[in-house]
């Protein structure tokens, strides 16, 4: 698949186009231009490293939304075996925006759950662009309770712009479904590892991201609102989105500094979409490390540690002491 380049990647795109042109020339010519191709490839790699070493939060948000990034089902198929997808919330309907089911991770039975956006237009519409309705969150909770019943660790993959704000979703109790998940996940008697793989949008992301360890991919984002949404509210124009992204602190490195996540998982140079295979290897190692220390903990200790980490979210300054 040909790589889709973002606006700030245009210098890289120009080099890659030159490389492709030279490859076509080499195929139709007796001239050996392999050295020139290798030189341009090295230049492209170095330029990619340089650009990605100083991304702004707004640029990171663009990478997090890249249409070629691996999605939940890609990770499940790559790092798990024997995946058996389960459907429906047993109350209203099945929501394709959230996928989940039983699988094996390194031979251990687990429950995997995550948002799924879709690749082409047809699938994007089917999966509502990764924006779950209440039945999606209730399906996720049903699978978590099933995991608790059978003593299975839960692995969640977060990648959503946010919960769907449609009238029907609100009528069916969107806020209640999200709130219920927050409550139940905080008390789930099995290990829960959550990983933000793309967009972590507001309560729609948080509804499957309460756990014992929260990871983020290097170029993923996690925020109470999108930069465009924040800019529209504060400055009445989406053009201020880069400023909003900076102020919101949406990047993995910033959230790690604030103590809101536990680990940043490195991505391949140029983002996860540039090398799916390498990203899958990194994900598998990270999940293995996350689970290793949790599966042996007694339930009481697991719940106490989870409660303690939740209670330590957020910091404030006492104005009276200033």
Curated annotation (Swiss-Prot):
GO terms for cellular component: acetyl-CoA carboxylase complex. It catalyses: N(6)-carboxybiotinyl-L-lysyl-[protein] + acetyl-CoA = N(6)-biotinyl-L-lysyl-[protein] + malonyl-CoA. Pathway: Lipid metabolism; malonyl-CoA biosynthesis; malonyl-CoA from acetyl-CoA: step 1/1. It is an enzyme of class 2 (transferase). Its EC number is 2.1.3.15. Disulfide bonds: none annotated. This is Acetyl-coenzyme A carboxylase carboxyl transferase subunit alpha. Belongs to the AccA family. It is found in: Cytoplasm. GO terms for biological process: fatty acid biosynthetic process; malonyl-CoA biosynthetic process. Residues 39-293 form the CoA carboxyltransferase C-terminal domain. Keywords: ATP-binding, Cytoplasm, Fatty acid biosynthesis, Fatty acid metabolism, Lipid biosynthesis, Lipid metabolism, Nucleotide-binding, Transferase. It comes from Laribacter hongkongensis (strain HLHK9). One of its GO terms (molecular function) is ATP binding.
């Amino acid at each position: 698949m040909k790589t889709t380049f973002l606006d700030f990647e245009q210098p890289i795109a120009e080099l890659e186009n030159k490389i492709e042109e030279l490859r076509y020339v080499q195929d139709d010519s007796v001239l050996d231009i392999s050295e020139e191709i290798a030189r341009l490839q090295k230049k492209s790699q170095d330029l990619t490293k340089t650009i990605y070493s100083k991304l702004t939060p707004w640029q990171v948000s663009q990478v997090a939304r890249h249409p070629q990034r691996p999605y939940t089902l890609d990770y499940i198929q790559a790092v798990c075996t024997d995946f058996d997808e389960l459907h429906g919330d047993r109350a209203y309907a099945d929501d394709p925006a959230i996928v989940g089911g039983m699988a094996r991770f390194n031979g251990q039975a687990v429950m995997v759950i995550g948002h799924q956006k879709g690749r082409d237009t047809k699938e994007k519409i089917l999966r509502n662009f990764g924006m779950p309705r209440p039945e999606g969150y209730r399906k996720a909770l049903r699978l978590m309770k099933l995991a608790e019943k059978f003593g299975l660790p839960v692995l969640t993959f977060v990648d959503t712009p946010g919960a769907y704000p449609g009238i029907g979703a609100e009528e069916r109790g969107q806020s209640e479904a999200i709130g219920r998940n927050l409550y139940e996940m905080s008390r789930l008697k099995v290990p829960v590892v959550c990983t933000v793989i793309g967009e972590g949008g507001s309560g729609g992301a948080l509804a499957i991201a309460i756990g014992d360890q929260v990871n983020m991919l290097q170029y993923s984002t996690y925020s109470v609102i999108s930069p465009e949404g924040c800019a529209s509210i504060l400055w009445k124009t989406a053009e201020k989105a880069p400023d909003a992204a900076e102020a919101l602190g949406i990047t993995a490195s910033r959230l790690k500094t604030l103590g809101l996540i536990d680990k940043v998982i490195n991505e391949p140079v140029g983002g996860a979409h540039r090398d799916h295979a390498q990203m899958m290897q990194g994900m598998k190692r990270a999940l293995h490390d996350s689970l290793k220390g949790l599966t042996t903990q007694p339930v009481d200790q697991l719940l106490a540690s989870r409660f303690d980490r939740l209670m330590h979210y957020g910091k404030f300054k006492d104005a009276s002491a200033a």
